[in-house]
Regions:
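Glycine-enriched alpha-helix->loop->beta-strand junction motifs that scaffold or abut catalytic
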Residues: 80-83, 111, 202-208, 318-319
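Hydrophobic faces of well-ordered beta-strands that scaffold small-molecule active sites
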Residues: 4-8, 48-50, 86-90, 115-119, ...
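Catalytic cores of alpha/beta
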Residues: 98-105, 247-253
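An alpha-helical appendage that flanks or caps ligand/catalytic pockets
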Residues: 2-4, 8-12, 38-42, 123, ...
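Conserved, mostly hydrophobic/aromatic
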Residues: 40, 44, 77, 107, ...
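Active-site mouth loops of central-metabolism enzymes
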Residues: 17-30, 89-98, 181-192, 243-246, ...
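Alpha-helix-loop-beta-strand connector modules within alpha/beta enzyme cores
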Residues: 61-87, 146, 342-351
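N-terminal beta1-alpha1-beta2 module of alpha/beta enzyme domains
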Residues: 1-80, 180-185, 256, 283
Length: 354
């Protein structure tokens, strides 16, 4: 068993990853994110990642109505840290590949070789209609076809002195982008569709997967590993997990109930509608959703022992290469996790490699 990677999903949007009026409410500020990044550095996590979001979901909490821009914030955090990997998110439908290539070559230089590019293809119409770049004629498959060509262009610009490409989505003519990065930035991609997994196997170094069950997660992880191997490559698999840790299971469960009681149903409905669910159906679902819907990912609640055992179980059973963690209370929770759970996970990994 190889050592696993553990990192955090930074709270780059207000409210972090909880849609609740009673949960902790990180603000969309550099100060918040810098503190979280420094906690990650100090406790020994492997990476920090931020999303890219252009429009929030309203509701009582105005969830993600305020968010920072991923690339500029992560460049600042690269300067503020020394060790953790710096993974920023880039929309392939927003940025010309020549612009993206130059930006990430710069981040790779600033970070001393720690940069990573989380590539997303822009699936939510509401984010991009507001500034006139949503192409409603592109299907899901078309967006991945565009993203494959975009990624090919970026990676070629990182290593070739001149690139010419003519595609339905962009044109490069004798395009130069120097200096080249000292090493290629890590490429990350999230998604579980057939098109997403095909893209991950061909281009990504890491894939973020979300299964509706542990069985599905296991199947997805095995599929991405196998597809990448068939392409002569290695692609690590990750999932996301929210950690609610306290001294006892009962105290952690109490937090879950308190935060669930304040679930922001309007924001939930708006989020679901952004996925393409008809508005009446989205609102009907949100009105009947249980409080746990306030959590945007799977979660574990409990003592240090409970959290440790749960993480070991899901990572082992699904053959994941790591997890990206979310902490509702970043300041105190990350310190507690670093003092208790993370050392146990590292010891478990080390024992497994002997």
């Amino acid at each position: 068993m190889s050592a696993k990677d553990y990192g955090i999903f930074l709270p780059i949007g207000n409210g972090g990853w909880m849609l609740s009026t009673t949960a902790p409410h990180p603000e969309a500020s550099y100060a918040w994110n810098k503190r979280a990044a420094l906690h990650a550095e100090n406790i020994g996590l492997d990476f920090i990642m931020s999303m890219a979001k252009w429009r929030g979901f309203g509701g009582t909490t105005d969830h993600w109505g305020r968010s920072l821009e991923s690339m500029t914030m992560m460049s600042a955090l690269a300067e503020a840290t020394d060790r953790v990997k710096i993974w920023a998110t880039m929309h392939a439908n927003v940025h010309n590949p020549a612009v993206a290539a130059k930006m990430y070559a710069t981040l790779q230089d600033v970070s001393g070789g720690r940069a990573g590019m989380n590539i997303v293809n822009g699936a939510y119409a509401g984010e991009f209609e507001q500034f006139g770049i949503w192409d409603e004629t592109l299907s899901h498959a078309d967006r991945y076809a565009m993203t494959e060509l975009w990624t090919e262009a970026v990676t070629r610009l990182w290593s070739e002195d001149s690139v010419t490409m003519h595609t339905p989505y962009f044109d490069l003519v004798d395009c130069e982008s120097r200096p080249h990065p000292s090493s290629q930035p890590t490429i990350i991609s999230a998604g579980k569709s057939e098109a997403a997994r095909a893209f991950q196997a061909r281009f990504a170094d890491g894939a973020f997967l979300a299964g509706d069950s542990l069985e599905e997660m296991t199947e997805l992880s095995a599929d991405v590993h196998a597809r990448a191997a068939a392409n002569g490559r290695t692609c690590k698999t990750y999932s996301m997990l929210t950690v609610v840790q306290d001294e006892t299971d009962a105290l952690a469960d109490k937090k879950v109930k308190e935060w669930g009681a304040g679930v922001d149903r309007e924001a939930l409905a708006n989020m679901r509608a952004s996925w393409g669910v008809p508005e009446d159906q989205a609102r009907a679902w949100a009105s009947g959703a249980v409080g746990e819907a306030a959590f945007q990912t799977a979660y574990v609640a409990g003592s240090a022992q409970t959290v440790t055992e749960h993480i070991q179980y899901i990572v082992g059973e699904a053959d994941l290469d790591g997890l990206m963690l979310i902490f509702p209370e970043y300041d105190q929770d990350m310190v507690l996790f670093g003092e208790t759970v993370l050392p146990a996970l590292r010891a478990h990994d080390e024992a497994g490699t002997r």
